[in-house]
Structures are given as structure tokens and as C-alpha cells.
Amino acid sequence: METLTAISRWLAKQHVVTWCVQQEGELWCANAFYLFDAQKVAFYILTEEKTRHAQMSGPQAAIAGTVNGQPKTVALIRGVQFKGEIRRLEGEESDLARKAYNRRFPVARMLSAPVWEIRLDEIKFTDNTLGFGKKLVWQR
């Protein structure tokens, strides 16, 4: 099974991403519902510009983050660690991403928050269902 295909299949079944941003030595993390685009290897999220993490990100920033489930047993642990870049989308790019996001999360139609893209440049997927400590690694 191809590494990116396996990772993408799992990410498509999840819906919450955690990412951390750094600015002038200060770190901050945030969570959001996401839409995963397997073709672009990117998450799309909504977050207000006034939030601390958006203020620290500015229009574009390097980030790191995770997506994980909450299994009750070690043998079922699966999760992704990643590094990449977050940027606020504008214009047609934003409109297309928002339409796709709203299809996944219809309640988001009521939100006016800007759309952001988290482009994944490196992914490490831990999947204990394939054997304890099994890691799949992908890089752009």
C-alpha cells in the first residue's frame, strides 16, 4: 500500500487538527475541524483573524501539528505528526475551498471566518494496527 494513500485514507476519516505556530519565540496551539484534500495534501480550516493563532500566523507561517484518535488501547493507536505552512486564502481559491468545506460541515455555512490552507510538507503516520510502533513517512 502506498504511504501517502494510506495516510490520506486515515486523514479523510478524521476531522480535528491541532497545529502550533511560533512568533518571536512565543508558541501557541489551536484546534479546528478540517477538510482534507488528498490531491493537494492540505487541510482547509476556518478561523477568525482576531484569534491569537491567526494573529501570530499573519498571512503565512511555518507550523507543526497533529491529528490523532482517542483509542483506549495502545494496539489501536493511530496518529499523524506533520510540519508545513499555513496561509490565509483569498479570492477564487478561498471560494472553492469554502464550498468544499461547507459540503463536509454544513453548519459552517453560518460562519464568516476566513478560509486557511495548511499545506503538509512532511508527515509521520504512526499506525499500531500494522504492528507496534509502525511508522509511515511521507515528504513533499
UniProtKB/Swiss-Prot annotation:
Database matches in HAMAP family: UPF0306
| Name the record gives this protein | UPF0306 protein YhbP
Where on the tree of life does the source sit, at the highest rank?
Bacteria
The opening ranks of the lineage are: Bacteria, Pseudomonadati, Pseudomonadota, Gammaproteobacteria, Enterobacterales
Q: Which family does it belong to?
A: Belongs to the UPF0306 family.
Do you know which SUPFAM superfamilies this protein is assigned to? Answer: FMN-binding split barrel
State which gene encodes it. Answer: yhbP
